[in-house]
Regions:
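Acidic/polar, low-complexity extended loops/arms that serve as protein-protein interfaces
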Residues: 1-161, 187, 192-198, 205-206
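Sequence/fold signature of self-assembling virion shell proteins
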Residues: 63-67, 72, 95-102, 179-274
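Active-site-proximal beta-strand/loop segments in catalytic clefts of secreted hydrolases
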Residues: 38, 167-170, 255
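C-terminal amphipathic alpha-helical segment
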Residues: 160-173
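Flexible loop/turn segments at secondary-structure boundaries
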Residues: 42-45, 88, 171-175, 212-215, ...
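Generic hydrophobic alpha-helical scaffold/packing signal
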Residues: 102, 147-150, 172, 176, ...
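A short acidic (Asp/Glu
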Residues: 125, 175-179
Length: 274
């Protein structure tokens, strides 16, 4: 006899599709989507002498750039199930498989949007982040190093409501043990049931399991304005069900298209281990 329920294994993935944190752009098609950029932060006005000639040598013209978002495609491969299972099961097999394939698509999206190479691939937020701090140790970070990471980002980005620290859970476990010079824990515990996240110095902590754990030469922590990372969704995730191709059995396939890019590496910086 078969139970009328199924126990499904679970694993946390990450936040990269979260529009409350990142800038998510939804488009119906997959044509290249360009984001204009400009960086005029190193240029200032000059003193003017009465009656003097104003310089006009194009030396301070504004230079514009752009970041491009494509639509990289990913699929789950066909997953098959038997006619007998479809008809004899108490639970809805097709619905369950659709849910599982949706989670598979979510895992690849989170992974690529985090650490994608950007070379004929999605550009992950970690990949294009700027260097904020290099830790002294191979498999540990200190409270001072986290402070240095935070202050490596300009206050213009630090003051954004979407500024946060991002790391995986094993790194967070190490960070939870850190104390300041007065013996107080650096991390302020939140209340997830009440929707209050953990914080460090008032900045929310975002757990992303696609980020590296503490080891040699790993970018284990990000800090900055997460809204400067743009996620492009080309249409929505799709599920295709084949009822005749595998007859008398059935098949189901998941498919999704997306891309991502960090508009300015100064907005989000990483802490890398030695």
């Amino acid at each position: 006899e078969l139970a009328d329920f199924i126990d499904k294994a679970m694993i946390a993935t990450g936040p990269m599709y979260n529009s409350d944190l990142f800038s998510v752009i939804n488009t119906t098609g997959g044509n290249t989507f360009n984001i204009p950029t400009v960086n005029d932060t190193t240029v200032a006005a000059e003193a003017h002498t009465e009656g003097g000639t104003v310089t006009d040598d194009a030396g301070k013209d504004v230079t514009f750039g752009q970041k491009s978002l494509g639509a990289f495609a990913f699929d789950t491969e066909w997953v098959r199930w038997s006619y007998e299972l479809a008809n004899d099961s108490i639970f809805n097999v097709e619905s369950l498989l659709g849910e599982l394939l949706g989670e598979r698509l979510g895992r690849i999206a989170n992974s690529k949007l985090t650490t994608g190479s950007g070379s004929s691939d999605v550009e992950g937020i970690v990949t294009n982040s700027g260097l904020g701090k290099t830790a002294a140790a191979v498999a540990a970070v200190t409270s001072d190093e986290i402070l240095d990471l935070i202050h490596s980002v300009d206050p213009a980005y630090r003051n954004s409501p979407k500024t946060a620290l991002m790391m995986n859970d094993s790194t967070l476990a190490a960070v939870r043990k850190l104390k300041d010079g007065n013996g107080n824990y650096l991390l302020s515990m939140g209340n997830f049931q009440a929707g209050v996240p953990n914080q460090i110095l008032g900045y929310n902590i975002v757990v992303n399991q696609a980020m590296d754990s503490l080891a040699t030469g790993k970018k284990v922590m990000l800090f900055g304005d997460m809204s400067k990372y743009y996620v492009r969704k080309a249409g929505g995730p799709s599920l295709f069900v084949a009822r005749e191709r595998f007859a008398p059995d059935y098949g189901i396939l998941g498919y999704v298209r997306f891309d991502g890019t960090l508009a300015n590496a100064a907005a989000v910086k990483h802490l890398i281990t030695a």
